[in-house]
Amino acid sequence: MVVTRIAPSPTGDPHVGTAYIALFNYAWARRNGGRFIVRIEDTDRARYVPGAEERILAALKWLGLSYDEGPDVGGPHGPYRQSERLPLYQKYAEELLKRGWAYRAFETPEELEQIRKEKGGYDGRARNIPPEEAEERARRGEPHVIRLKVPRPGTTEVKDELRGVVVYDNQEIPDVVLLKSDGYPTYHLANVVDDHLMGVTDVIRAEEWLVSTPIHVLLYRAFGWEAPRFYHMPLLRNPDKTKISKRKSHTSLDWYKAEGFLPEALRNYLCLMGFSMPDGREIFTLEEFIQAFTWERVSLGGPVFDLEKLRWMNGKYIREVLSLEEVAERVKPFLREAGLSWESEAYLRRAVELMRPRFDTLKEFPEKARYLFTEDYPVSEKAQRKLEEGLPLLKELYPRLRAQEEWTEAALEALLRGFAAEKGVKLGQVAQPLRAALTGSLETPGLFEILALLGKERALRRLERALA
Protein backbone atom coordinates (compact mmCIF):
# COMPACT_ATOMS: atom_id res chain seq x y z
CA MET A 1 0.00 0.00 0.00
CA VAL A 2 1.22 3.51 -0.81
CA VAL A 3 1.63 5.60 2.36
CA THR A 4 2.59 9.29 2.09
CA ARG A 5 2.99 12.00 4.68
CA ILE A 6 3.62 15.66 5.26
CA ALA A 7 5.49 16.81 8.32
CA PRO A 8 5.03 20.56 8.83
CA SER A 9 6.76 22.45 11.63
CA PRO A 10 4.57 24.66 13.87
CA THR A 11 6.89 27.66 13.57
CA GLY A 12 4.49 30.23 12.06
CA ASP A 13 1.62 30.69 9.64
CA PRO A 14 0.48 27.71 7.53
CA HIS A 15 2.60 28.08 4.38
CA VAL A 16 1.43 27.91 0.78
CA GLY A 17 4.48 25.70 0.08
CA THR A 18 3.24 23.19 2.67
CA ALA A 19 -0.14 23.09 0.91
CA TYR A 20 1.57 22.53 -2.47
CA ILE A 21 3.59 19.56 -1.18
CA ALA A 22 0.57 18.23 0.78
CA LEU A 23 -1.50 18.26 -2.40
CA PHE A 24 0.89 15.94 -4.25
CA ASN A 25 1.23 13.61 -1.24
CA TYR A 26 -2.56 13.51 -0.95
CA ALA A 27 -3.10 12.87 -4.67
CA TRP A 28 -0.52 10.06 -4.87
CA ALA A 29 -2.00 8.30 -1.81
CA ARG A 30 -5.58 8.64 -3.11
CA ARG A 31 -4.60 7.62 -6.66
CA ASN A 32 -3.28 4.34 -5.24
CA GLY A 33 -5.97 3.74 -2.61
CA GLY A 34 -3.33 4.38 0.05
CA ARG A 35 -3.02 6.42 3.23
CA PHE A 36 -2.02 10.04 3.83
CA ILE A 37 -0.51 10.99 7.21
CA VAL A 38 0.08 14.36 8.89
CA ARG A 39 2.91 14.43 11.42
CA ILE A 40 3.94 17.52 13.36
CA GLU A 41 7.70 18.14 13.50
CA ASP A 42 7.85 20.25 16.65
CA THR A 43 11.37 19.39 17.81
CA ASP A 44 12.77 22.89 17.16
CA ARG A 45 11.61 24.31 20.48
CA ALA A 46 13.28 27.70 19.92
CA ARG A 47 11.08 28.40 16.87
CA TYR A 48 7.89 26.76 18.17
CA VAL A 49 4.82 29.05 17.94
CA PRO A 50 1.80 28.22 20.16
CA GLY A 51 -1.36 27.75 18.08
CA ALA A 52 0.55 27.20 14.83
CA GLU A 53 -0.23 23.47 14.74
CA GLU A 54 -3.98 24.08 15.00
CA ARG A 55 -3.81 26.65 12.19
CA ILE A 56 -1.85 24.27 9.91
CA LEU A 57 -4.41 21.49 10.43
CA ALA A 58 -7.33 23.91 9.92
CA ALA A 59 -5.75 25.17 6.66
CA LEU A 60 -5.37 21.61 5.31
CA LYS A 61 -9.03 20.91 6.09
CA TRP A 62 -10.07 24.24 4.50
CA LEU A 63 -8.26 23.12 1.33
CA GLY A 64 -10.16 19.82 1.39
CA LEU A 65 -7.07 17.67 2.03
CA SER A 66 -8.42 15.14 4.50
CA TYR A 67 -5.81 12.91 6.15
CA ASP A 68 -6.13 9.37 7.49
CA GLU A 69 -3.80 9.74 10.47
CA GLY A 70 -2.68 12.80 12.41
CA PRO A 71 -2.48 14.49 15.81
CA ASP A 72 -6.18 15.41 15.93
CA VAL A 73 -7.61 12.28 14.25
CA GLY A 74 -5.33 9.66 15.79
CA GLY A 75 -4.33 6.41 14.11
CA PRO A 76 -2.33 3.23 14.68
CA HIS A 77 1.10 4.91 14.52
CA GLY A 78 0.70 7.70 17.09
CA PRO A 79 1.60 9.88 18.74
CA TYR A 80 1.83 12.21 15.74
CA ARG A 81 3.79 15.02 17.42
CA GLN A 82 7.52 14.42 17.50
CA SER A 83 7.82 16.09 20.92
CA GLU A 84 5.70 13.21 22.28
CA ARG A 85 8.00 10.56 20.74
CA LEU A 86 11.31 11.52 22.40
CA PRO A 87 11.97 8.14 24.11
CA LEU A 88 11.75 6.47 20.67
CA TYR A 89 14.46 8.67 19.17
CA GLN A 90 16.70 8.19 22.21
CA LYS A 91 16.27 4.41 21.88
CA TYR A 92 17.16 4.43 18.18
CA ALA A 93 20.14 6.76 18.71
CA GLU A 94 21.48 4.27 21.30
CA GLU A 95 20.92 1.51 18.75
CA LEU A 96 23.15 3.35 16.25
CA LEU A 97 25.87 3.74 18.90
CA LYS A 98 25.80 -0.03 19.50
CA ARG A 99 26.01 -0.73 15.76
CA GLY A 100 29.02 1.57 15.33
CA TRP A 101 27.05 4.00 13.13
CA ALA A 102 27.13 6.90 15.61
CA TYR A 103 29.35 8.45 18.28
CA ARG A 104 29.06 10.84 21.21
CA ALA A 105 30.62 14.30 20.76
CA PHE A 106 31.33 16.58 23.73
CA GLU A 107 32.44 19.89 22.17
CA THR A 108 31.01 23.06 23.73
CA PRO A 109 29.24 25.63 21.48
CA GLU A 110 32.36 27.83 21.72
CA GLU A 111 34.64 24.97 20.63
CA LEU A 112 32.31 24.16 17.72
CA GLU A 113 32.37 27.78 16.60
CA GLN A 114 36.17 27.73 16.62
CA ILE A 115 36.26 24.43 14.64
CA ARG A 116 33.86 25.91 12.05
CA LYS A 117 36.04 28.98 11.66
CA GLU A 118 39.17 26.91 11.18
CA LYS A 119 37.84 23.93 9.21
CA GLY A 120 34.63 25.26 7.61
CA GLY A 121 32.57 22.58 9.39
CA TYR A 122 32.79 19.85 11.99
CA ASP A 123 35.86 17.66 11.42
CA GLY A 124 34.74 14.48 13.21
CA ARG A 125 37.38 14.74 15.95
CA ALA A 126 35.15 13.04 18.57
CA ARG A 127 35.26 9.85 16.45
CA ASN A 128 38.65 9.23 18.09
CA ILE A 129 37.30 9.11 21.65
CA PRO A 130 37.33 5.43 22.75
CA PRO A 131 33.71 4.22 23.18
CA GLU A 132 34.29 3.22 26.85
CA GLU A 133 35.56 6.71 27.68
CA ALA A 134 32.62 8.33 25.83
CA GLU A 135 30.13 6.13 27.74
CA GLU A 136 31.77 7.00 31.06
CA ARG A 137 31.65 10.76 30.31
CA ALA A 138 27.98 10.44 29.29
CA ARG A 139 27.21 8.52 32.52
CA ARG A 140 28.77 11.36 34.52
CA GLY A 141 26.26 13.71 32.88
CA GLU A 142 28.70 15.59 30.65
CA PRO A 143 26.63 17.48 27.99
CA HIS A 144 27.02 15.94 24.55
CA VAL A 145 25.34 15.21 21.24
CA ILE A 146 25.14 11.98 19.22
CA ARG A 147 26.48 12.26 15.67
CA LEU A 148 26.15 10.04 12.59
CA LYS A 149 29.39 8.20 11.77
CA VAL A 150 29.50 8.46 7.98
CA PRO A 151 31.53 5.53 6.52
CA ARG A 152 34.71 6.86 4.91
CA PRO A 153 35.94 6.39 2.28
CA GLY A 154 32.97 5.40 0.15
CA THR A 155 29.98 6.65 -1.81
CA THR A 156 26.24 6.83 -1.19
CA GLU A 157 23.72 6.43 -3.98
CA VAL A 158 20.40 8.29 -3.89
CA LYS A 159 17.67 7.32 -6.31
CA ASP A 160 15.15 10.10 -6.86
CA GLU A 161 12.07 8.99 -8.81
CA LEU A 162 11.91 12.34 -10.64
CA ARG A 163 15.60 13.13 -11.07
CA GLY A 164 17.31 9.76 -11.45
CA VAL A 165 20.33 8.46 -9.51
CA VAL A 166 22.79 10.82 -7.81
CA VAL A 167 26.00 9.42 -6.30
CA TYR A 168 27.54 11.32 -3.37
CA ASP A 169 31.14 11.03 -2.17
CA ASN A 170 30.95 10.23 1.55
CA GLN A 171 33.74 12.77 2.19
CA GLU A 172 31.12 15.41 1.29
CA ILE A 173 28.50 14.04 3.72
CA PRO A 174 28.90 15.57 7.20
CA ASP A 175 28.72 13.72 10.52
CA VAL A 176 25.45 15.45 11.33
CA VAL A 177 24.00 15.67 14.84
CA LEU A 178 21.24 13.08 15.32
CA LEU A 179 20.36 13.69 18.98
CA LYS A 180 20.92 17.09 20.61
CA SER A 181 22.22 17.59 24.14
CA ASP A 182 18.66 18.33 25.37
CA GLY A 183 17.51 14.87 24.24
CA TYR A 184 15.60 16.21 21.23
CA PRO A 185 16.33 14.66 17.83
CA THR A 186 17.32 16.60 14.74
CA TYR A 187 15.20 16.42 11.60
CA HIS A 188 17.41 13.68 10.14
CA LEU A 189 16.94 11.08 12.87
CA ALA A 190 13.30 11.86 13.69
CA ASN A 191 12.19 11.87 10.07
CA VAL A 192 13.82 8.51 9.23
CA VAL A 193 12.63 6.78 12.43
CA ASP A 194 9.08 8.11 12.03
CA ASP A 195 8.82 7.35 8.31
CA HIS A 196 9.92 3.76 9.00
CA LEU A 197 7.66 3.21 12.02
CA MET A 198 4.67 4.80 10.27
CA GLY A 199 5.14 2.61 7.18
CA VAL A 200 5.76 5.52 4.79
CA THR A 201 6.52 4.12 1.33
CA ASP A 202 6.84 7.35 -0.68
CA VAL A 203 8.57 10.51 0.58
CA ILE A 204 7.37 13.46 -1.52
CA ARG A 205 8.98 16.72 -0.41
CA ALA A 206 10.59 19.95 -1.61
CA GLU A 207 13.84 19.81 -3.57
CA GLU A 208 15.70 21.66 -0.79
CA TRP A 209 15.76 18.30 1.07
CA LEU A 210 17.59 16.54 -1.77
CA VAL A 211 21.01 17.38 -0.27
CA SER A 212 19.96 15.75 3.04
CA THR A 213 18.77 12.55 1.38
CA PRO A 214 22.20 10.80 1.39
CA ILE A 215 22.19 11.21 5.19
CA HIS A 216 18.75 9.60 5.32
CA VAL A 217 19.80 6.78 2.97
CA LEU A 218 22.78 6.07 5.26
CA LEU A 219 20.47 5.97 8.29
CA TYR A 220 18.18 3.44 6.60
CA ARG A 221 21.27 1.35 5.84
CA ALA A 222 22.51 1.69 9.43
CA PHE A 223 19.21 0.41 10.83
CA GLY A 224 18.89 -2.32 8.19
CA TRP A 225 15.58 -0.88 6.96
CA GLU A 226 14.31 -0.58 3.40
CA ALA A 227 14.35 3.05 2.28
CA PRO A 228 11.16 4.58 0.82
CA ARG A 229 10.90 5.97 -2.71
CA PHE A 230 12.00 9.64 -2.85
CA TYR A 231 10.45 12.40 -4.98
CA HIS A 232 11.84 15.93 -4.66
CA MET A 233 9.41 18.53 -6.01
CA PRO A 234 10.57 21.88 -7.44
CA LEU A 235 10.18 24.82 -5.06
CA LEU A 236 7.53 27.46 -5.66
CA ARG A 237 9.15 30.66 -6.91
CA ASN A 238 8.44 34.39 -6.87
CA PRO A 239 7.98 36.07 -10.28
CA ASP A 240 11.70 37.03 -10.09
CA LYS A 241 12.50 33.26 -9.84
CA THR A 242 13.74 33.43 -6.24
CA LYS A 243 12.36 30.91 -3.73
CA ILE A 244 8.91 32.00 -2.55
CA SER A 245 9.20 33.83 0.76
CA LYS A 246 7.06 36.10 2.91
CA ARG A 247 9.42 39.01 2.17
CA LYS A 248 8.28 39.08 -1.47
CA SER A 249 4.98 37.17 -1.59
CA HIS A 250 1.98 36.30 0.50
CA THR A 251 2.90 32.84 1.77
CA SER A 252 0.33 32.38 4.55
CA LEU A 253 -2.72 30.25 3.72
CA ASP A 254 -4.60 32.28 6.34
CA TRP A 255 -4.01 35.42 4.22
CA TYR A 256 -5.56 33.78 1.12
CA LYS A 257 -8.57 32.67 3.14
CA ALA A 258 -9.03 36.14 4.69
CA GLU A 259 -8.71 37.80 1.27
CA GLY A 260 -11.58 35.71 -0.08
CA PHE A 261 -9.75 33.22 -2.27
CA LEU A 262 -11.71 30.00 -2.71
CA PRO A 263 -10.06 26.81 -1.45
CA GLU A 264 -11.03 25.07 -4.72
CA ALA A 265 -9.32 27.76 -6.82
CA LEU A 266 -6.16 27.89 -4.69
CA ARG A 267 -5.96 24.10 -4.74
CA ASN A 268 -6.46 24.01 -8.53
CA TYR A 269 -3.78 26.67 -8.99
CA LEU A 270 -1.29 24.80 -6.78
CA CYS A 271 -1.90 21.64 -8.85
CA LEU A 272 -0.87 23.61 -11.96
CA MET A 273 2.36 24.64 -10.24
CA GLY A 274 3.77 21.15 -10.75
CA PHE A 275 1.39 19.31 -13.04
CA SER A 276 -0.32 19.62 -16.43
CA MET A 277 -3.53 17.88 -17.45
CA PRO A 278 -3.25 15.55 -20.49
CA ASP A 279 -5.85 17.68 -22.34
CA GLY A 280 -4.15 20.94 -21.35
CA ARG A 281 -7.13 22.42 -19.49
CA GLU A 282 -6.47 24.64 -16.50
CA ILE A 283 -9.71 24.34 -14.52
CA PHE A 284 -10.31 20.94 -12.92
CA THR A 285 -11.55 19.40 -9.68
CA LEU A 286 -9.46 17.64 -7.05
CA GLU A 287 -11.04 14.33 -8.10
CA GLU A 288 -10.09 14.95 -11.75
CA PHE A 289 -6.53 15.78 -10.65
CA ILE A 290 -6.29 12.50 -8.72
CA GLN A 291 -7.68 10.48 -11.65
CA ALA A 292 -5.22 12.03 -14.12
CA PHE A 293 -2.20 12.03 -11.78
CA THR A 294 1.02 10.42 -13.00
CA TRP A 295 4.61 11.40 -12.18
CA GLU A 296 5.36 11.65 -15.92
CA ARG A 297 3.19 14.79 -16.02
CA VAL A 298 5.04 16.48 -13.12
CA SER A 299 7.33 19.28 -14.27
CA LEU A 300 10.72 19.94 -12.65
CA GLY A 301 10.95 23.57 -13.82
CA GLY A 302 10.77 26.16 -11.04
CA PRO A 303 7.03 26.99 -10.97
CA VAL A 304 6.27 30.71 -10.60
CA PHE A 305 3.54 31.53 -8.11
CA ASP A 306 1.77 34.46 -9.77
CA LEU A 307 -0.88 36.17 -7.64
CA GLU A 308 -2.55 37.75 -10.68
CA LYS A 309 -2.98 34.34 -12.34
CA LEU A 310 -4.48 33.02 -9.09
CA ARG A 311 -6.89 36.00 -8.99
CA TRP A 312 -7.92 35.22 -12.58
CA MET A 313 -8.56 31.59 -11.66
CA ASN A 314 -10.48 32.58 -8.52
CA GLY A 315 -12.68 34.84 -10.66
CA LYS A 316 -13.30 31.96 -13.09
CA TYR A 317 -14.46 29.80 -10.17
CA ILE A 318 -16.79 32.56 -8.91
CA ARG A 319 -18.31 33.11 -12.36
CA GLU A 320 -18.22 29.70 -14.01
CA VAL A 321 -17.65 26.86 -11.56
CA LEU A 322 -19.63 27.60 -8.40
CA SER A 323 -23.41 27.95 -8.58
CA LEU A 324 -24.99 31.34 -7.87
CA GLU A 325 -26.34 29.92 -4.59
CA GLU A 326 -22.86 28.77 -3.52
CA VAL A 327 -21.29 32.16 -4.25
CA ALA A 328 -24.09 33.92 -2.34
CA GLU A 329 -23.51 31.61 0.63
CA ARG A 330 -19.76 32.19 0.61
CA VAL A 331 -19.89 36.00 0.49
CA LYS A 332 -21.97 36.11 3.70
CA PRO A 333 -19.04 36.06 6.17
CA PHE A 334 -17.37 38.86 4.18
CA LEU A 335 -20.55 40.97 4.22
CA ARG A 336 -20.84 40.46 7.98
CA GLU A 337 -17.20 41.38 8.46
CA ALA A 338 -17.86 44.61 6.54
CA GLY A 339 -20.80 45.32 8.87
CA LEU A 340 -23.40 44.79 6.13
CA SER A 341 -26.69 42.88 6.21
CA TRP A 342 -29.15 41.80 3.51
CA GLU A 343 -32.92 41.98 3.53
CA SER A 344 -33.59 38.51 2.08
CA GLU A 345 -31.87 35.52 0.45
CA ALA A 346 -33.49 36.45 -2.87
CA TYR A 347 -32.10 40.01 -2.64
CA LEU A 348 -28.60 38.72 -1.85
CA ARG A 349 -28.68 36.22 -4.73
CA ARG A 350 -29.76 38.92 -7.19
CA ALA A 351 -27.05 41.29 -5.91
CA VAL A 352 -24.42 38.56 -6.37
CA GLU A 353 -25.78 37.78 -9.84
CA LEU A 354 -25.47 41.43 -10.90
CA MET A 355 -21.98 41.85 -9.43
CA ARG A 356 -20.57 38.45 -10.40
CA PRO A 357 -18.66 39.66 -13.49
CA ARG A 358 -17.06 42.39 -11.37
CA PHE A 359 -15.34 40.66 -8.45
CA ASP A 360 -12.50 38.11 -8.39
CA THR A 361 -12.34 37.43 -4.64
CA LEU A 362 -15.10 37.08 -2.05
CA LYS A 363 -13.66 40.02 -0.12
CA GLU A 364 -14.10 42.31 -3.13
CA PHE A 365 -17.86 41.72 -3.18
CA PRO A 366 -18.75 43.90 -0.15
CA GLU A 367 -16.18 46.49 -1.29
CA LYS A 368 -17.64 46.80 -4.79
CA ALA A 369 -21.32 46.20 -3.93
CA ARG A 370 -21.48 48.28 -0.75
CA TYR A 371 -24.17 50.62 -2.17
CA LEU A 372 -26.54 47.65 -2.54
CA PHE A 373 -26.52 47.00 1.22
CA THR A 374 -26.24 50.35 3.01
CA GLU A 375 -26.76 54.10 2.68
CA ASP A 376 -23.21 54.61 3.95
CA TYR A 377 -21.17 54.20 0.75
CA PRO A 378 -18.37 56.32 -0.76
CA VAL A 379 -18.91 58.68 -3.72
CA SER A 380 -16.05 58.87 -6.22
CA GLU A 381 -14.83 62.23 -7.52
CA LYS A 382 -15.81 61.28 -11.08
CA ALA A 383 -19.31 60.32 -9.93
CA GLN A 384 -19.67 63.59 -8.01
CA ARG A 385 -18.70 65.61 -11.11
CA LYS A 386 -21.07 63.63 -13.33
CA LEU A 387 -23.87 64.10 -10.80
CA GLU A 388 -23.36 67.87 -10.71
CA GLU A 389 -23.36 68.06 -14.53
CA GLY A 390 -26.63 66.15 -14.73
CA LEU A 391 -28.57 67.80 -11.88
CA PRO A 392 -30.89 69.84 -14.18
CA LEU A 393 -31.94 66.66 -16.05
CA LEU A 394 -32.33 64.65 -12.81
CA LYS A 395 -34.61 67.35 -11.36
CA GLU A 396 -36.92 66.89 -14.34
CA LEU A 397 -36.64 63.09 -14.24
CA TYR A 398 -37.51 62.82 -10.54
CA PRO A 399 -41.31 63.39 -10.83
CA ARG A 400 -41.49 60.88 -13.72
CA LEU A 401 -39.81 58.23 -11.59
CA ARG A 402 -42.04 59.09 -8.64
CA ALA A 403 -45.12 58.59 -10.83
CA GLN A 404 -43.83 55.29 -12.29
CA GLU A 405 -45.98 52.44 -11.01
CA GLU A 406 -44.46 49.41 -12.75
CA TRP A 407 -40.97 49.17 -11.16
CA THR A 408 -39.38 46.53 -13.41
CA GLU A 409 -36.21 46.58 -15.50
CA ALA A 410 -38.16 46.71 -18.77
CA ALA A 411 -40.56 49.46 -17.64
CA LEU A 412 -37.74 51.59 -16.18
CA GLU A 413 -35.67 51.21 -19.36
CA ALA A 414 -38.66 52.36 -21.46
CA LEU A 415 -39.18 55.35 -19.15
CA LEU A 416 -35.52 56.48 -19.25
CA ARG A 417 -35.13 56.00 -23.00
CA GLY A 418 -38.36 57.92 -23.62
CA PHE A 419 -37.23 60.73 -21.30
CA ALA A 420 -33.81 61.05 -23.04
CA ALA A 421 -35.46 61.12 -26.49
CA GLU A 422 -37.93 63.76 -25.36
CA LYS A 423 -35.09 65.95 -24.04
CA GLY A 424 -33.01 65.39 -27.18
CA VAL A 425 -30.03 63.93 -25.27
CA LYS A 426 -28.21 60.60 -25.37
CA LEU A 427 -29.28 57.98 -22.85
CA GLY A 428 -25.85 58.18 -21.12
CA GLN A 429 -26.42 61.87 -20.30
CA VAL A 430 -29.35 60.80 -18.14
CA ALA A 431 -28.15 57.36 -17.05
CA GLN A 432 -24.67 58.30 -15.78
CA PRO A 433 -25.77 61.12 -13.41
CA LEU A 434 -28.59 58.86 -12.17
CA ARG A 435 -26.10 56.01 -11.65
CA ALA A 436 -23.87 58.39 -9.66
CA ALA A 437 -26.83 59.48 -7.51
CA LEU A 438 -27.86 55.88 -6.76
CA THR A 439 -24.45 54.21 -6.25
CA GLY A 440 -21.72 56.84 -5.79
CA SER A 441 -19.88 55.22 -8.71
CA LEU A 442 -19.83 55.24 -12.51
CA GLU A 443 -18.61 51.63 -12.70
CA THR A 444 -21.55 49.41 -11.82
CA PRO A 445 -23.77 46.75 -13.38
CA GLY A 446 -26.65 47.86 -15.62
CA LEU A 447 -28.59 50.87 -14.33
CA PHE A 448 -32.04 49.38 -14.97
CA GLU A 449 -31.09 46.25 -13.00
CA ILE A 450 -29.82 48.37 -10.10
CA LEU A 451 -32.97 50.52 -10.07
CA ALA A 452 -35.14 47.40 -9.99
CA LEU A 453 -33.06 45.74 -7.25
CA LEU A 454 -32.91 48.80 -4.98
CA GLY A 455 -36.67 49.20 -5.27
CA LYS A 456 -38.68 52.37 -5.82
CA GLU A 457 -38.63 53.72 -2.29
CA ARG A 458 -34.88 53.42 -1.78
CA ALA A 459 -34.03 54.69 -5.29
CA LEU A 460 -36.23 57.78 -4.85
CA ARG A 461 -34.77 58.46 -1.40
CA ARG A 462 -31.23 58.45 -2.83
CA LEU A 463 -32.23 60.68 -5.72
CA GLU A 464 -33.89 63.13 -3.30
CA ARG A 465 -30.67 63.22 -1.26
CA ALA A 466 -28.63 63.97 -4.39
CA LEU A 467 -30.99 66.77 -5.45
CA ALA A 468 -31.14 68.38 -2.01
Curated annotation (Swiss-Prot):
Binding site for ATP: H15, E208, L236, K243, I244, S245, K246, R247
Regulation affecting activity: In the absence of bound tRNA, ATP is bound in a non-productive mode, and the enzyme cannot activate amino acids.
Annotated keywords: Aminoacyl-tRNA synthetase, ATP-binding, Cytoplasm, Ligase, Nucleotide-binding, Protein biosynthesis
GO biological process: glutamyl-tRNA aminoacylation
Positions of region (Interaction with tRNA): 432-447
One Pfam family, short name: Anticodon_2
Binding, L-glutamate: R5, I6, A7, E41, Y187, H188, L189, A190, N191, R205
InterPro entries to which the protein is assigned, alphabetical: aa-tRNA-synth_I_cd-bd, aa-tRNA-synth_I_codon-bd_sub2, aa-tRNA-synth_I_CS, aa_tRNA-synth_I_cd-bd_sf, Glu-tRNA-ligase_bac/mito, Glu-tRNA-synth_I_codon-bd_sub1, Glu/Gln-tRNA-synth, Glu/Gln-tRNA-synth_Ib_cat-dom
Cited Gene3D superfamilies: 1.10.10.350, Glutamate-tRNA synthetase, class I, anticodon-binding domain 1, HUPs
GO molecular function: ATP binding; glutamate-tRNA ligase activity; tRNA binding; zinc ion binding
Motif 'HIGH' region per UniProt: ranges: 8-18
Function of the molecule: Catalyzes the attachment of glutamate to tRNA(Glu) in a two-step reaction: glutamate is first activated by ATP to form Glu-AMP and then transferred to the acceptor end of tRNA(Glu).
Subunit structure: Monomer.
Protein's UniProt name: Glutamate--tRNA ligase
Organism per entry: Thermus thermophilus (strain ATCC 27634 / DSM 579 / HB8)
Protein encoded by which gene: gltX
